[in-house]
Structure formats: structure tokens, C-alpha cells
């Protein structure tokens, strides 16, 4: 095990000099001898002359030139397997929940290659989420990748928590949650939410929150993914939740300049597409098991053409776009039914009836969107009878797309609802065909199935 010395510290980036014949490989983990604290560095570049440039996985406070650094001779390795369930870990796989050692039987390196072509599997099976707007407009595939896109404060984390609650309770498999650069409070809420709904013993939690150094946030997604890969390779169907993939990109941007790379568009790192690809290509399903991933994607300034969300789009099977405009109407989940897409919305996969209902809902909402300008200028009375009917149905559909969430019961005061796909299709089909034209539109707001609408209308 070779030993080197620190020769330069610039924020999260540390240069270490080793003997010429014992230079560490790129991605090797190094450990700094700094009193009782363990600090791990990861080699990013070899600069020549025995010098390597590394990213610190913890705070570089207290480091000084001349400190000894040991080469561990392998990449960062984290615990995998059942011992990680119900535990909260950091980027290095160390427990941070005060419950003692993980007691793992095996550790895996966080840098691994993606599965080869012949190992990959293709599944057309749908994953029911119990959320009407998602099941109808942008259905999820088992073993697929889903992105939740939204600006600040439109409900990405709440939507993700609801998805975890619904899928983890209805689906009996294991889940891995990687908190990448999000609020510590949300991580805490999330842990208690999982404990209260008794699914904590099926979830592994890996946190690298906002206050952590960039090296930590850059690698914590890989730590979570490695744990998910282990479950997949044991033949299980795993759920991988990443909140938030944008912070992964941002951490890369923070260290990129310190590593001496030229910035590209909007100041992002030049390796943006490659870094995203390395992570996303590993999140895949093989013939042994599947990884279904749900990733929250922060959209800077609500601009979907920003390089970070735009790069993420290319990797996804379904995109759920949360809209500030819909949130401002008080319709939650604030999913935009015209902007959200899914590869699964194909008559050969979801069936002709589901496909026709989804497209019918879209066309009614699109027509309503076009008529809004006329209504704003001339009023409803100037519309033809046919258009008046379209507007009335569109407003009912818009309200019926809202739904009370289990995880938001404390805010809304109304109990959460899980709606099966069959009931969802039946409800929207009925509205489109005019079966509920006689009911007032407020009866459709914040309910579960269409039967509740009828009950609610009787009380109005």
C-alpha cells in the first residue's frame, strides 16, 4: 500500500504526490491520516510526475500540506445486501442513523460497468401507481426509467414520496432511496414517513445532503445504485428513487472547474452528457432482475431546455412534467397532461381502450387551451354549443386529474386515495362520453374514483 503526501488543497480538490512507481489508478480511493477523522479522497486525474488530483468525499477543513495519504488500492466500496435495509448511510456506506454497524457480508465498488447487451431484458409490463393522472397519461413500465420534472416548489418530492408509499406498499419488493443534494429536513421527514407506513425494513436510504461537499454529492447516487444493482443481481425487482438528479449534475459542475476543465454551455462541465450516461446506463434491467427508477429532476428557472434537464430527457421511458401554472390553480398533483409523455402509451402495450381514453382526454384539454384566449376576450357566450360542451368537460377533467395524497394528509386534511387503473379509465371515459355532464364541476375536485364524484355531488 503506497503512501503519498498532500501538496495542494483547493476547496474540495486535493493534489497528492506519490512515488513515480506507485501512482494510484483513476477512481482509486485514498485515505488521509488526519487524527481521528477518516477522510477519503477519490483520484480523478493523473497530472504526471507522480501527482494525482483527487476529490474529497468529506470536508477538506483541517487538511494541510505534508499530511500522509494511503492508497487503498481499490475504488470506494460500500455495503450491499439485506443488511442495508432499514438503514441510513452516507456516500461511503457508513451508517449515519446511530444504530451501530451495518454488519454487511459483502462490499461492492461503486464504479462498475453497465450490463452488456446480451444481459439486458425488455419488459412491457405496466406498474400501477394509484395516481390517476400518471396511470392514465404517462404510465410507468416495470423496469423502466421515469423522470419527475419541475421547478422549485411544484411538488417533486411530495409526488415521489407518494409514489414510494403506493408502490412500496402495493409492490412487495425492495427499494433504494438516494438523497442527492436535497434538504436534510426532507430526508428526516422521509425516514419517519417510511417508519410510520411500516415499509422502512424494505428500504435502504443513502443520503448526501445539501450541506455536504460536492465530491460527496457527486458519488452518492452511485452508492445507492450499487446497492440496487446487488438486489437486482439476486433476482429481485428493485425500485430506485433518486432525489434529485440535477444536484448530481451540479456537484459535477462544482468540481469540474477546480479540476481545471473548461466550462461548456451555461457553465456546465464539458463531460455533462458522459457523466449522465455513465449513471443512467447502469440503471437498467437484466434477465435476472429489474430496476425501476424514479428520478426527480429540478428544472432551473422552469426552463426545460436547460442543458441539465435536456440531457436527462434522452435517458427516460416516461416523463412526468409538473407545471407551475397547474399548481397555481390549486390542482395537485400538478402534472401537465399535455407535456407528460410515456413510451408505454401505445395501444399494443396498454390496450386500445386505455390509449383512446388518454388521447381523448388530451384532445379535449388541448381544445380548451386553444379556446382560453377567446373566452378571455369575448366570454363563454360567444362559443358554439359544441365548444361550450368541450369547455365544460375539460374543466371537469382538469379537476378530476387532482387527487388527495396519503403523504399530504397532514396538509390537506382529507384522506389519501389509491385509484386502480380500471377505475381511472372508467371515470375519464364517462366524463368524455357525457355521462356526468349534469354534475357540478366542483364535485370532481380532490376525489378518488368517479363513484366519489357522484356521492360528493349529492351533498353539494
Swiss-Prot record:
Q: How does it sit in the membrane?
A: Peripheral membrane protein
Assembly and oligomerization:
F-type ATPases have 2 components, CF(1) - the catalytic core - and CF(0) - the membrane proton channel. CF(1) has five subunits: alpha(3), beta(3), gamma(1), delta(1), epsilon(1). CF(0) has three main subunits: a(1), b(2) and c(9-12). The alpha and beta chains form an alternating ring which encloses part of the gamma chain. CF(1) is attached to CF(0) by a central stalk formed by the gamma and epsilon chains, while a peripheral stalk is formed by the delta and b chains.
Locations listed in the record: Cell inner membrane
Underlying gene: atpD
Question: What is the taxonomic lineage of the source species?
Answer: Bacteria, Pseudomonadati, Pseudomonadota, Gammaproteobacteria, Enterobacterales
Protein task: Produces ATP from ADP in the presence of a proton gradient across the membrane. The catalytic sites are hosted primarily by the beta subunits.
One term under GO cellular component? plasma membrane
The molecular function GO annotations come to: ATP binding; ATP hydrolysis activity; proton-transporting ATP synthase activity, rotational mechanism
* Pfam name, any one: ATP-synt_ab
Q: Which UniProt keywords apply?
A: ATP synthesis, ATP-binding, Cell inner membrane, Cell membrane, CF(1), Hydrogen ion transport, Ion transport, Membrane, Nucleotide-binding, Translocase, Transport
By its UniProt entry, which Gene3D superfamilies does this protein fall under? Answer: 2.40.10.170, Bovine Mitochondrial F1-atpase, Atp Synthase Beta Chain, Chain D, domain 3, P-loop containing nucleotide triphosphate hydrolases
Highest taxon in the source lineage: Bacteria
Q: Which residues bind ATP?
A: 150-157
Reactions listed under catalytic activity: ATP + H2O + 4 H(+)(in) = ADP + phosphate + 5 H(+)(out)
Q: Does the keyword Cell membrane apply?
A: yes
Q: Which PANTHER family match?
A: ATP SYNTHASE, ATP SYNTHASE SUBUNIT BETA, MITOCHONDRIAL
Question: What protein family does this chain belong to?
Answer: Belongs to the ATPase alpha/beta chains family.
- SMART domains recorded: AAA
Protein name in UniProt = ATP synthase subunit beta
EC number(s) for this protein? Answer: 7.1.2.2
State the PROSITE patterns in the record.
ATPASE_ALPHA_BETA (PS00152)
Amino acid at each position: 500500500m503506497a503512501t503519498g503526501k498532500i501538496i495542494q488543497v483547493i476547496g474540495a480538490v486535493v493534489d497528492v504526490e506519490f512515488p513515480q512507481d506507485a501512482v494510484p489508478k483513476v477512481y482509486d480511493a485514498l485515505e488521509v491520516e488526519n487524527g481521528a477523522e477518516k477522510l477519503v479522497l477519490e483520484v480523478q486525474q493523473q497530472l504526471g510526475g507522480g501527482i494525482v488530483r483527487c476529490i474529497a468525499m468529506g470536508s477538506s477543513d483541517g487538511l494541510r500540506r505534508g499530511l500522509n495519504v494511503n492508497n487503498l488500492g481499490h475504488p470506494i466500496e460500500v455495503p450491499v445486501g439485506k443488511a442495508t435495509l432499514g438503514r441510513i448511510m452516507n456516500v461511503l456506506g457508513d451508517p449515519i442513523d446511530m444504530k451501530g454497524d451495518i454488519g454487511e457480508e459483502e462490499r461492492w465498488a461503486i464504479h462498475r460497468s453497465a450490463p452488456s447487451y446480451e444481459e439486458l431484458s425488455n419488459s412491457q409490463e405496466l406498474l400501477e401507481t394509484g395516481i390517476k393522472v400518471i396511470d392514465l397519461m404517462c404510465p410507468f413500465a416495470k423496469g423502466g426509467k421515469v423522470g419527475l420534472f419541475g421547478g422549485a416548489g411544484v411538488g417533486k418530492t411530495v409526488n415521489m414520496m407518494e409514489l414510494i408509499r403506493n408502490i412500496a406498499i402495493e409492490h412487495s419488493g425492495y427499494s433504494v432511496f438516494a438523497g442527492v443534494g436535497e434538504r436534510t429536513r426532507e430526508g428526516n421527514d422521509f425516514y419517519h414517513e417510511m417508519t410510520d407506513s411500516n415499509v422502512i425494513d424494505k428500504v435502504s436510504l443513502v443520503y448526501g445532503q445539501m450541506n455536504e461537499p460536492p465530491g460527496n454529492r457527486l458519488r452518492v447516487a452511485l452508492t445507492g445504485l450499487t446497492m440496487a444493482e446487488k438486489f437486482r443481481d439476486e433476482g429481485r425487482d428493485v425500485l430506485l428513487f433518486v432525489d434529485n438528479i440535477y444536484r448530481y449534475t451540479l456537484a459535477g459542475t462544482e468540481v469540474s472547474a477546480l479540476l481545471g476543465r473548461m466550462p461548456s454551455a451555461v457553465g456546465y462541465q464539458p463531460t455533462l452528457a458522459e457523466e449522465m450516461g455513465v449513471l443512467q446506463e447502469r440503471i437498467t434491467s437484466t434477465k435476472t432482475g429489474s430496476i425501476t427508477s424514479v428520478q426527480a429532476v429540478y428544472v432551473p428557472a422552469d426552463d426545460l431546455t436547460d442543458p441539465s434537464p435536456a440531457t436527462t430527457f434522452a435517458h427516460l421511458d416516461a416523463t412526468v412534467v409538473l407545471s407551475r401554472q397547474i399548481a397555481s390553480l390549486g390542482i395537485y398533483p400538478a402534472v401537465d397532461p399535455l407535456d407528460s409523455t410515456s413510451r408505454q402509451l401505445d395501444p399494443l402495450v396498454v390496450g386500445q381502450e386505455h390509449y383512446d381514453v388518454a388521447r381523448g382526454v388530451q384532445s379535449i384539454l388541448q381544445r380548451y387551451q386553444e379556446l382560453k384566449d377567446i373566452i378571455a376576450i369575448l366570454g363563454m357566450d360567444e362559443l358554439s354549443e359544441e365548444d361550450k360542451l368541450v369547455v365544460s368537460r375539460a374543466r371537469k377533467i382538469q379537476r378530476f386529474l387532482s387527487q388527495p395524497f396519503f403523504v399530504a394528509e397532514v396538509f390537506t386534511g382529507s384522506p389519501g386515495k389509491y385509484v386502480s387503473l380500471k377505475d381511472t379509465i372508467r371515470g375519464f371515459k364517462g366524463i368524455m362520453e357525457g355521462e356526468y355532464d349534469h354534475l357540478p364541476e366542483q364535485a370532481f375536485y380532490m376525489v378518488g374514483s368517479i363513484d366519489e364524484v357522484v356521492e360528493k355531488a349529492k351533498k353539494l
